[in-house]
Regions:
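Intrinsic-disorder/low-complexity, polar/charged segments enriched in Ser/Thr/Lys/Arg/Asp/Glu/Gln
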Residues: 1-5, 61-63
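Compact, glycine-rich, soluble single-domain proteins
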Residues: 7-57
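C-terminal structural segments of small proteins and small subunits
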Residues: 53-89
Length: 89
């Protein structure tokens, strides 16, 4: 299963708007994707409640994993999304 690590750029981390954008993008991939904060347990990235429950803050490292056809491309798209400070606009 491919994995990617990325530091979250949004000033407030994965809360409210950034979390919503992230989850919408995950769902649009059609793939099972997980996200974990640091060395924590992975959660289903399709659930906004689980994603927000991780309490990911600015510059926290998360690990994304996906399974299925085009998993690498989906992970790259998600990494690029998390590198953007969505709170700056």
């Amino acid at each position: 299963m491919p994995e990617r690590k990325v530091n979250v750029a949004s000033r407030v981390g994965l809360h409210a708007r950034p979390a919503s954008l992230f989850v919408q993008t995950v769902v649009s991939t059609g793939l099972p994707v997980t996200i974990a904060k640091g060395d924590g347990n992975p959660v289903d990235a399709r659930s906004i409640l689980l994603v927000m429950g991780l309490a990911v803050g600015n510059n926290d490292e998360v690990t994304l994993a996906a399974e299925g056809e085009n998993a690498d491309a989906a992970l790259e798209q998600l990494v690029e999304l998390l590198k953007i400070d969505h709170d700056a606009t």
